[in-house]
């Protein structure tokens, strides 16, 4: 993490560098003042010797005041504590038949200091949604920390239509209103799964500026211009009470000139300032772009990308990655391959914190649980906040300690490698909104 922290000290903007120039003179002045205070105390008229120990990292000396006073060893040490861990806000969404997998993903991602919104769309049966609702309401940890919410009034979600964007905006608005303080918003599906513990993720992101947005994007839309941008689609999920697939109208439209189109992955990790921006839309760009994408095929793969790359204040905050391991055809099709045990080592070697797409009860998930997350069946992923024992199959998180304690493992080193690569001179600025 020292390399990562050192790198970010270099990429801070000029104003921040200028603001820090007064720190060294202030520190020197403070030390001199304390030194004079020490001398004053040592030579006090009462004749009593009063010692005031103080410290500055890396400095040791002996102070002599008159020959009758013994040398005083002054150990000056400034303890540098690690930065506070961020708080993450997750949306985990699913459709019919995803209830059990959604629960598993939630348990694998759980940490008391994070916030979670879960959603099963209206294609799911009432029984499946009630089962998830009961699970959230009755889980001991969720009850105690009150940080898991379910969208009870379910939305229709069509992946290829704007209803998925609407659902993401819905969850983000709930988290802004009810989720308290958090730093990044992460949207996942029930088919996603973590490859690292939350302690690994929180530790690594402690050292990053909180305004970074991890979003895979490009303006080179290629074939998508003729197949997605120019055709006009209608998503019945916006106005019908039953789910139906999108349909096309005969007329086509020209490419927009009021803003530039971008495309990329539908999965992202967005900063709170950017989430505030696209929910509130104070310069109206997010609303204008949203209305345009209401008739755009696969709008989740373009809406947020187009907004962030056309909003001047956020363009330079983008990191061109979705932080996922995904196995695609070449050229990519609508959906990626389902991951299996054969993909396990490639997942680990990717250094990505998340992977998709998994089938329910795929054996590779058990391998991820045991070898990467150290999670037992039916339990949350343990972290530094879990101080119970594992004896006789006990849940270590049944006994809760300090929730601010983070104990990163090998997963943190893998994420650090990925982040260092993404923020290198060759990959960071040159790949922003191009």
From Swiss-Prot:
Sites where a glycan is attached: 138, 187, 316, 392
Role: Beta-glucuronosyltransferase involved in the biosynthesis of type II arabinogalactan (AG). Modifies both the beta-1,6-linked galactan and beta-1,3-linked galactan present in type II AG.
Enzyme Commission numbers on file: 2.4.1.-
PANTHER family per record: BETA-GLUCURONOSYLTRANSFERASE GLCAT14B, GLYCOSYLTRANSFERASE
Record GO cellular component, one term: Golgi membrane
Segment forming the signal sequence: none
Name the record gives this protein: Beta-glucuronosyltransferase GlcAT14B
GO molecular function: glucuronosyltransferase activity
UniProt lineage: Eukaryota, Viridiplantae, Streptophyta, Embryophyta, Tracheophyta
């Amino acid at each position: 993490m020292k390399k990562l922290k050192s790198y970010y000290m270099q990429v801070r903007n000029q104003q921040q560098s200028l603001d820090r120039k007064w720190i060294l003179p202030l520190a020197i002045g403070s030390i001199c003042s304390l030194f004079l205070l020490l001398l004053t105390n040592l030579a006090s008229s009462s004749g009593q010797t009063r010692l005031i120990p103080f410290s500055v990292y890396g400095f040791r000396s002996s102070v002599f005041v008159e020959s009758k006073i013994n040398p005083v060893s002054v150990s000056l040490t400034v303890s540098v504590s690690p930065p506070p861990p961020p708080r993450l806000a997750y949306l985990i969404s699913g459709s019919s038949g995803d209830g059990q997998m959604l629960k598993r993903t939630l348990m694998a991602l759980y940490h008391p200091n994070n916030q979670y919104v879960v959603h099963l769309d209206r294609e799911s049966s009432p029984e499946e949604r009630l089962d998830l609702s009961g699970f959230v309401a009755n889980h001991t940890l969720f009850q105690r920390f009150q940080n898991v919410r379910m969208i009870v009034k379910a939305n229709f979600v069509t992946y290829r239509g704007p209803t998925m964007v609407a659902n993401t905006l819905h969850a983000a608005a709930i988290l802004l209103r009810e989720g308290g303080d958090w730093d990044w918003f992460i949207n996942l599906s029930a088919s996603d799964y973590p490859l690292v513990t939350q302690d690994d993720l929180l530790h690594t992101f402690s050292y990053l500026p909180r305004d970074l947005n991890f979003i895979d994007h490009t303006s080179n839309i290629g074939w998508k211009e003729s197949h997605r941008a120019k055709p006009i689609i209608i998503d019945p999920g916006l106005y019908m009470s039953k789910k139906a697939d999108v349909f096309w109208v005969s007329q086509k439209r020209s490419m927009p000139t009021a803003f530039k189109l971008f495309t990329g992955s539908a999965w992202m990790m967005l900063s709170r300032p950017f989430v505030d921006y696209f929910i509130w839309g104070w310069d109206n760009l997010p609303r204008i772009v949203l209305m345009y994408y209401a008739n755009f095929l696969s709008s989740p793969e373009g809406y947020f990308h187009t907004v962030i790359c056309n909003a001047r204040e956020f363009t330079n905050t983008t990191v061109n990655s979705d932080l996922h391991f995904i196995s695609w055809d070449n050229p990519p099709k609508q959906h990626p391959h389902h991951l299996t045990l054969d993909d396990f080592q490639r997942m680990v070697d990717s250094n990505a914190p998340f992977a998709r797409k998994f089938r329910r009860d795929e054996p590779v998930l058990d391998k991820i649980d045991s070898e990467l997350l150290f999670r037992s069946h039916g339990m949350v992923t343990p972290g530094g906040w879990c101080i119970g024992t594992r004896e006789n199959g006990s849940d270590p998180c049944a006994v809760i300690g300090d929730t601010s304690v983070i104990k990163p493992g090998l997963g943190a080193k893998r994420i650090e490698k990925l982040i260092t690569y993404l923020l290198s001179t060759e990959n960071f600025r040159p790949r922003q909104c191009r």
